[in-house]
Amino acid sequence: MAMKRFPLEKYATLELNHVEFARTGNLIAQTPLGAEFTAEAPCENGMWVCADRSKGVVASIEDVNEPIGVVYTAEKEYDMYHYGLKHFGRKVAGDYPRVGILEKGDTMTTNCLQYDDGEFADEETLYEALAAWQTTPVYVVPVVGSPVPQLTATKPTEGTFGKVCKFYTVPNGERGVKYQITNI
């Protein structure tokens, strides 16, 4: 059993559908990325990170009950032929991402996800489960030690988690998942 990333071309994409932090200003923008974010493992939009400002850096989640935020740094237009979206990653330690602290009811669409191949054997099995979200719930949960949230059919009992409410595409045309935060 191993964790596998949701298929994407380069970097993950995020679309904020309805989020409270945009209205309330409950966000982090002046805290640098921790040392775990490198050129080989950059910080991407849609990642869930620890939203505890007292730690001094944006880092992976250490406890599912700590405040959790989603990275939503604005994509860049590199030039008139190369737009951000799937080609944009916040990159490495020392950079300052924008992180919105999740609230119950927040809804977003992303392909920044991972799954356990012990639960979903392959991409096709995962896609079948996501397509049946109306009859068989699929949840989005934090992963201790990883900034990439996980898709699972097992309903969590604590901490922040969301529920899939649509399986379609992200703004760059790749497959994606729309989910709503249902528990904080």
Language-model segments: what does each one mean?
Residues 1-184:
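Surface-exposed, low-hydrophobicity beta-strand/loop segments enriched in small/polar/acidic residues
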